[in-house]
Amino acid sequence: NLFNGEYYEHEVRTPRRTRDMAPSLRLHMGAAKVMQPDYQLGNGCLVDQLVGQFMAHVCGLGYLVKPSHVRRTLRSITKYNRRDGFIDHFNCMRSYAMGDESALLLASYPRGRPDNPFPYFTEVMTGFEYTAAIGMLYEGQDAAGLRAIDDIRSRYDGAKRSPFDEA
């Protein structure tokens, strides 16, 4: 079970022996240390960890996991990934939210960050935010879901950024 009581974690499973891994998989993105790979989400709280549940709802398939876990996970995403203001937010990647804007980060590490974490965790991307927001709306977390959507619309209001080119 990957649910830690607040959200679903990414369990990093390494091969028993390096030679058990295809050579082509050992070339890039943290694969130099196969038994301790870099750039993994690990115990991070990922904004779109429930994308499968979102699609299951859209398709009328019902719940894939315990409904209480879904609701708790979405509350955790709001708690840990929501950021109001990016003035003091370090992001060495692409910045799709700046200044006094608000957004949901791709990932957060409330239980401790690995030395070399998932490289995009400090970024914001609307597609992932919408997935979380719609999940919140499906689960009756209307205020949080609508706030996430309002944050996006505020960033892409036609003055600061094009409303036809959300990143």
Regions found by a protein language model. Give the residues of each.
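Catalytic cores of secreted or luminal carbohydrate-active enzymes
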Residues: 167
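Alpha-helical support elements that line or immediately flank enzyme active sites
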Residues: 53, 57-63, 129-142
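Extended glycan-interaction surfaces of carbohydrate-active proteins
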Residues: 1-125, 147-164
